[in-house]
Design a protein with these regions (language model features):
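Classical Sec-dependent N-terminal signal peptides that target proteins to the secretory pathway
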Residues: 1-15
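Patatin-like phospholipase
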Residues: 12-50, 60-234
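Catalytic nucleophile serine of serine hydrolases
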Residues: 53
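Residues forming the Rossmann-fold NAD(P)(H) cofactor-binding site
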Residues: 56
C-alpha cells in the first residue's frame, strides 16, 4: 500500500491520478496537511477526487481552493475564528452549522466552477431495509456540493437532531457506514487515510480537538508527505 502511494506521487506531474479520501474523524487536519503539501509541491492537473465522510470536505476544499498551505486560514474559513475546540459531545452540531454557513458565505457571489472530477459518497437510508452507498458526481452549484458533503459526514443524532440529513428527496448519513475500504495497488491512485504514512496516533483523543492540536496534525500530514517524496526524488 505505502509503495503504491509513493509511486503514484512520483508520476503525479504527468499522469492521471485518482485521489480517494476516506473517513477522517478527528484526523481531518492530517489529511489536509497531506493534500496541502501535494497541492503546493506536486500540483496535479489531471485527476479525479472522491471524498467519503470527513474526506468529502477535504475533496471540496481541494477543488475550490488554490492554496491549502495555511492551517489557521483553513480553520478560520471553515470552522470559524470564534471556535477553538471541537468536541464530539458538546459542540459538533454548532461546528457543522458554522462550516456550512462559512463555506456558503465564502463562495457566494463567486463563480466557483464545480469540478467535473469530484465525487462524494454518502449512505442513503431512505429505505431502512436497503441501506446503500450512493455516489454523486454532478452538482447544481457550490451550495449543492456543500450540502451533500455534509450529508457524507453526518453521524445520526450527533451531527444533528435527527437520524439523517435530508438532501433532494433523500435521507443520508455518514458515507463510511456502507463503504468498504479496498486495498489499492494502482500506482496512479492516492488513497488517503490516517495510516498511509505509518504514523502512530495512539495518544490522540478521538473525541476532542483543539485548534493547536489540529495545527500539529496538519504539520504531521505535510511533513510526512514531504519526507516520503524527498526519498523518492533523490
Amino acid at each position: 500500500m505505502k509503495l503504491a502511494i509513493a509511486m503514484s506521487l512520483f508520476f503525479i506531474a504527468n499522469a492521471f491520478v485518482n485521489i480517494n479520501i476516506c473517513g477522517s474523524g478527528i484526523y481531518l487536519p492530517y489529511y489536509m496537511g497531506v493534500l496541502g503539501c501535494i497541492k503546493k509541491n506536486y500540483p496535479i492537473s489531471n485527476y479525479s477526487i472522491t471524498g467519503i465522510s470527513g474526506g468529502a470536505l477535504c475533496s471540496l476544499l481541494y477543488t475550490q481552493e488554490k492554496d491549502l498551505s495555511n492551517h489557521d486560514k483553513l480553520w478560520d474559513m471553515t470552522i470559524g475564528k470564534n471556535i477553538s475546540v471541537i468536541s464530539l459531545h458538546t459542540n459538533i452540531k454548532k461546528v457543522r452549522e458554522q462550516i456550512e454557513y462559512n463555506l456558503k458565505l465564502r463562495y457566494s457571489g463567486i463563480k466557483n466552477k464545480i469540478s467535473e472530477n469530484i465525487s462524494i459518497i454518502s449512505t442513503n437510508v431512505g429505505n431502512f431495509y436497503e441501506i446503500k452507498s450512493e455516489t454523486i458526481s454532478s452538482f447544481d452549484n457550490i451550495n449543492d456540493l456543500i450540502d451533500f458533503s455534509l450529508c457524507s459526514s453526518y453521524i445520526p443524532y450527533i451531527s444533528g437532531s435527527n437520524f439523517s440529513k435530508y438532501y433532494k428527496d433523500g435521507n443520508y448519513i455518514d458515507g463510511q457506514v456502507t463503504y468498504e475500504n479496498i486495498e489499492l495497488s494502482d500506482v496512479n491512485t492516492l488513497y488517503l487515510h490516517k495510516g498511509m504514512w505509518n504514523r502512530d496516533f495512539s495518544n490522540m483523543n478521538n473525541l476532542l480537538l483543539s485548534k493547536s492540536e489540529s495545527q500539529k496534525l496538519f504539520e504531521y500530514g505535510w511533513n510526512d508527505t514531504n519526507k516520503k517524496n524527498i526519498k523518492i526524488f533523490k
